[in-house]
Regions:
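Beta-hairpin "wing" of winged helix-turn-helix
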Residues: 33-38, 66-75, 79-82
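Extreme N-terminal segment that seeds HTH/winged-HTH DNA-binding domains in transcriptional regulators
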Residues: 1-39, 93, 97-123
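A short alpha-helical element within helix-turn-helix/winged-helix DNA-binding domains
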Residues: 37-50, 64
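Residue cluster at the C-terminal edge of the helix-turn-helix DNA-binding motif
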Residues: 49, 63-69, 109
Length: 125
């Protein structure tokens, strides 16, 4: 997989970069740019593309492997999990995380869960 033509993410200074790299790779999988079994860009290539230290990319890849999103073939590199449900699993987790983030922010604004639910329902109709 080549990184050519991809839009480089803008990093949020309030979040660890390795977590943002993990999310970038997950979005590539969810969008179908990386498919189950595809080779993930090398640590070096990803670091050059993103303009970050290779150790940061390595940490992100290690965490992605720990959670089962990618796996390593010794001497060949990193690959997207061959689990056919990986895209759905990643998408579901990312959606839940986003909903939880905004739910917390809305509650901090004083909205109840019922009010949040009604607003969301209203927006989707």
């Amino acid at each position: 997989m080549t990184l050519e033509g991809l839009i480089k993410p803008e990093f949020d200074p309030n979040l660890p970069i390795y977590l943002q790299i993990m999310n970038f790779v997950k979005k590539l999988i969810v969008r179908g740019i990386l498919k189950p079994g595809d080779k993930v860009p090398s640590v070096r290539d990803m670091a050059l593309f993103l303009g970050v230290n290779p150790n940061t990319v390595q940490k992100a890849y290690e965490e992605l492997e720990r959670e089962g999103t990618i796996f390593t073939r010794r001497g060949q590199g990193n690959f997207v999990s061959e689990d056919e449900n990986i895209v759905d699993k990643i998408k579901e987790r990312m959606v839940k995380d986003l909903i939880e983030k905004y739910r917390k922010e809305l509650e901090e604004l004083g909205l109840s869960k019922g009010e949040i639910f009604n607003l969301l329902k209203e927006m989707l109709e």
